[in-house]
Amino acid sequence: MPHFKIAHLREQGQNIIIVPLESSFEHKSDEDQRATIAELQVRARGAGLAGTVVPVWQSGGRMYSIAPGPWRSFFQNVSMRSVLLNVNKELYW
């Protein structure tokens, strides 16, 4: 059963569902990454969570994300430590 600890935040007037993933996410194909994000989005909505899913992962001592264009600058200034400190919900199915 998939199980994720997430940070459900409201930033810049938007609900954001930040999902920390394993570093192996970086090595998935673009298609597999999109499928994972879509699945997480459907499951988050099904759990009653409003917002857009943004996956984040650590690689080489740095955090990476796949975020909508307007949020990219926000995520450039966020660390994985900060994300983990803001974990406030769990998503599982």
Question: What function would you assign to each model-found segment?
Answer:
Residues I16-L21:
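Short, aliphatic-rich beta-strand segments
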Residues F25-L49:
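Short, non-transmembrane amphipathic alpha-helical segments
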Residues A47-Q58:
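A generic structural motif
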Residues M1-A7:
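Active-site metal-binding core of divalent-cation-utilizing nuclease and nuclease-like domains
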Residues H8-G13:
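Short glycine/proline-enriched loop/turn "hinge" motifs that connect secondary-structure elements
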Residues Q41-V42, G51-T52, V87-E90:
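Short, intrinsically disordered/low-complexity patches at protein termini
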